[in-house]
């Protein structure tokens, strides 16, 4: 089976938006107009094709990025292949957004015409800047009360610090919004609002003629700056033709010099088709963006993979989902080469082989089996054993690791327990499945209490995972209050000489160990044996190490795991009959418990690196508030029109921060935080914690 669409005719793009900007409705409309969907699902009544997890339909927010393939015939009569990646719009899911931005070539940023640029839009826009993603802006909901296209355009400049390039103007607003002026063709496009109706092309309304001329003039001035020859011609009085103008806008958009702005209302079916034409005309094909960089596994040097079927195969796994019919699905973007069913590939991150069994092309709620896929494709692979999000799969003869995605450490933990015995086993399976899908979610069990602890990126993040457990895996669970992950360590050296003896008829137990416990700079545990002359036989030494390691998980103060301890076995004694590995294990365990007390145990707390991005007006409040949370401000800097405040703050003081920040800045500031290091807890605080956990 040969390639059906040339790679130049692919558009891999996503739609990024604030939580209520109408993204799901827009995606639905796109799927309808591109012929994949016969009945439109409205988020208003909770039935939409792209949001395919129940909670999303209930909460009306998009959580998982589903990838969809569809087709559109452009203005030139040629069909293009669209791969649309749906991205979530809630701040606790920004990890999903980052993940999908990695595999996109371009994006449409949706704005709500009434609200303009909202806080979440700023966050996602910044993430897209980081990956240098070409973007267009669609000002949606033009039919809403208070819709203001011109204010939204102004906010793209003032709030996002980006260059806005309107290529359309709205005709009317709110209830009177009927269509748009196309500033390239200088025609009016109007719609009667019936679903799927084509636009009526007519003359620009007389009362808008001057405004249209003024905006077209601005459009041309910005566009010709992209190209020297066009600039010279323009200065000599030669205007670019409409096709030349489109080519200039395309070039500037792909180079992220400016962002074309369109408008309409997806819900009322006005402005959708011109947006699809703009995707073809302005957003990049895989061949228009720089080749993806990676590390050559054999030489450890940087290498690239061109978007071509002839290049060695390389692909990135960017999402894992559980499908009720197919089981685990790994969504991958093929950057180079050609993938055939049945081949065996190398997972270079894990150093394991994977065989490609079933390959699926996904529509948001249906799927088709395929036998091969090409550079630029986004495919779902069923039944991969080793691959997790962010892994590279490639040709075993030309191994490469495409840039690793970096996932922040979870910052919040809660204890979770099954309601009934029957739920116990199901809960284990459910949590492991969810952790495989989402690298920012971790599961562990607390040795002391035997409780299962789940950790994630925020309170909403964990809420939704617990909810999914209930629905998808039918597990009922009780959830505790959020907790901080404390640690313990020692502050000075201590030497312990401990003898373990037990005699009760038959063979007894005997072991004596002399160990020095001391602090060291790392977080790990170091064990060293300095036994000479066989006072402890070689075969018993691993027992000493194992004994100490087995109790490192619960420190003497409040039962938290120990960090940064070095143990040196310097002497000991054994008995020919009564000594055993087990006896030495028991002796070293007791020696450690005694040693940790003597070596000045102390409590450590996680310190978070907090970055707050806030409008100038709220900087004072933000800094004052961080100081009151035992925070240390490490600096402030200007970023575009906002100010970035960097600080180190104990996690224990960051619970509920999202709400305080929201009210402090009227929802305009955002923050990110990730774990940085552990630090001793101040004495007063430490005593409270010990009381609580004693």
From Swiss-Prot:
Disulphide bonds in the chain: none
Which UniProt keywords are listed? Cytoplasm, Elongation factor, GTP-binding, Nucleotide-binding, Protein biosynthesis
One GO biological process term is: ribosome disassembly
Q: Which InterPro entries match?
A: EFG_II (IPR041095), EFG_III (IPR009022), EFG_III/V (IPR035647), EFG_IV (IPR047872), EFG_V (IPR035649), EFG_V-like (IPR000640), EFTu-like_2 (IPR004161), G_TR_CS (IPR031157)
Where is this gene product found? Cytoplasm
What GO cellular component is one of the record's annotations?
cytoplasm
Q: Which domain of life is it from?
A: Bacteria
Q: Does the keyword Transmembrane apply?
A: no
Pfam families attached here?
EFG_C, EFG_III, EFG_IV, GTP_EFTU, GTP_EFTU_D2
Binding residue positions for GTP: 17-24, 86-90, 140-143
The entry lists its GO molecular-function terms as:
GTP binding; GTPase activity; guanosine tetraphosphate binding; translation elongation factor activity
Query: In this protein, which residues make up the domain named tr-type G?
Result: 8-287
| NCBIfam families in alphabetical order | EF-G, PRK12740.1-5, small_GTP
The function of this protein is:
Catalyzes the GTP-dependent ribosomal translocation step during translation elongation. During this step, the ribosome changes from the pre-translocational (PRE) to the post-translocational (POST) state as the newly formed A-site-bound peptidyl-tRNA and P-site-bound deacylated tRNA move to the P and E sites, respectively. Catalyzes the coordinated movement of the two tRNA molecules, the mRNA and conformational changes in the ribosome.
Which family is it part of?
Belongs to the TRAFAC class translation factor GTPase superfamily. Classic translation factor GTPase family. EF-G/EF-2 subfamily.
Q: HAMAP family from the entry?
A: EF_G_EF_2_B
**What name appears for this protein in its UniProt entry?**
Elongation factor G
Specify the species. Brucella melitensis biotype 1 (strain ATCC 23456 / CCUG 17765 / NCTC 10094 / 16M)
- Upper lineage ranks? Bacteria, Pseudomonadati, Pseudomonadota, Alphaproteobacteria, Hyphomicrobiales
